[in-house]
């Protein structure tokens, strides 16, 4: 009887222990569930503005569907306002207007809260393992110092397979095209821009929204994937040859062989790096491209600040025309998926900026790289996309644009509208809204994407590198001049056919050697514009030789001079002159001065 009771008591104690454990878990689990808090990035003390609340996102699969909505508009100054960096957070009560490609504002409020649907698929990208901005800046600084991209070991690179835009899905491509077409500004009087850097107040400045690079930031429902759509702030592609815009300056700086020099007089020159015809200082060009007020530097800063808001999100990039080229350069720098539309060929600036390049590739030919994750959509009737908008009669030239680059990195997805639709090459087909309505929506299928093969930029040019930041060229020239002098007697006693045959004194010419060393700080089209010359002249006198001609001939002196015989002058008088010439007098003989021989008489 006692044994069953003892066993029952033991099991009762065990049940009590299990119950106690379950009660403890029940008390802990609610606290774990309620521990979810919105994550704040960057402290209030570190920045002058209140950061937005960005909740943590769950990991998602590489393939799926995303619904993106506009979350922020970021303005990064470049030319006139290099310190400007402002952000507009989109709220339910935000009022926006649409800006057309011609720069005309729509008076009606824009509808921007409609979600953009896109799908993702796995994409493999070869990129740096350490992609922190500070590390990237070190690589770029080393490239500027060395004159080319630094060589990194294979251990510093990795091939990652991540979620990227589905470039085989027409709806996804349309979504990205519409994102690049959107350009919004706040309704006047409702502005709510925040200064990110907290240094300057541009609320009373005029025109700051027309300076620099603008990014529209879209995020999906979980904030796990964001899309940065980059665009230049000059809405109209061509605003006349007499108007200077930031886009024109950056276009000619990044996509010209030498900053708009060496071509049409209509091109706007944005640096002075040309030495002579088809010869330029590459160091000078690279320094101009890396100025802090240029679009590439602005894109790095813009990307860095956006990723601080979404540190764990997957970032996709897109853009149209110049914005597409900047998105591609940014994607090559950080190893991000990129989808562009009618982008300017960007392999030339990618090589000059010294972007990190994986082992086995030539840094001077980034168009040969594989696994970049970049896809460039465009059609054959667009001269900007095809790299042919640089002829004498092209609209680009007449607009002041020197767009000489022809090669894209990554893969090109080309609609052959010239062959399929009979289109003529024209700049009007470059507009993104025309591309959406007349190309992407009209074609049933997307084009096949393939890398560009055997493409080279600026083949006629020769580039050299200079030491240091100052543009200096030094040349040394040696000039030899000969001066011939001759001394003649004052009276010519023996005239000849081609001059006097009298005694003459001839002096061998002295030889003068002049060495000129010039330093040129500003090379011009056909030479140096500000030479400072130092001339050293050395003159060597030759010995003087005197010769006497005694027996002159037709072409010079033949032998020593023989004694001369002087004759007395003959005298004649004419008493009966002729009518026209001659004398009718009887000739008067003149005795010879030489004594005649004696007459011999025979005895």
Curated annotation (Swiss-Prot):
Residues 1-20 are cytoplasmic. SUPFAM superfamilies: alpha/beta-Hydrolases. Disulfide bonds: none annotated. Gene3D superfamilies: alpha/beta hydrolase. InterPro entries: AB_hydrolase_fold, ATG15_Lipase, Fungal_lipase-type. It comes from the Eukaryota. Its EC number is 3.1.1.3. It is a single-pass type II membrane protein. The chain crosses the membrane at residues 21-41. Residues 42-603 are lumenal. Glycans are attached at residues 166, 201, 223, 281, 305, 467. GO terms for cellular component: endoplasmic reticulum; membrane; multivesicular body membrane; vacuolar lumen; vacuolar membrane. It is found in: Endosome, Multivesicular body membrane; Prevacuolar compartment membrane. The active site is at 321 (charge relay system). It holds the Pfam family Lipase_3. One of its GO terms (biological process) is phosphatidylserine catabolic process. It is an enzyme of class 3 (hydrolase). Lipase which is essential for lysis of subvacuolar cytoplasm to vacuole targeted bodies and intravacuolar autophagic bodies. Involved in the lysis of intravacuolar multivesicular body (MVB) vesicles. The intravacuolar membrane disintegration by atg15 is critical to life span extension. Belongs to the AB hydrolase superfamily. Lipase family. Binds to both phosphatidylinositol (PI) and phosphatidylinositol 3,5-bisphosphate (PIP2). PANTHER family: LIPASE ATG15-RELATED (PTHR47175:SF2). This is Putative lipase atg15. The lineage of its organism: Eukaryota, Fungi, Dikarya, Ascomycota, Pezizomycotina.
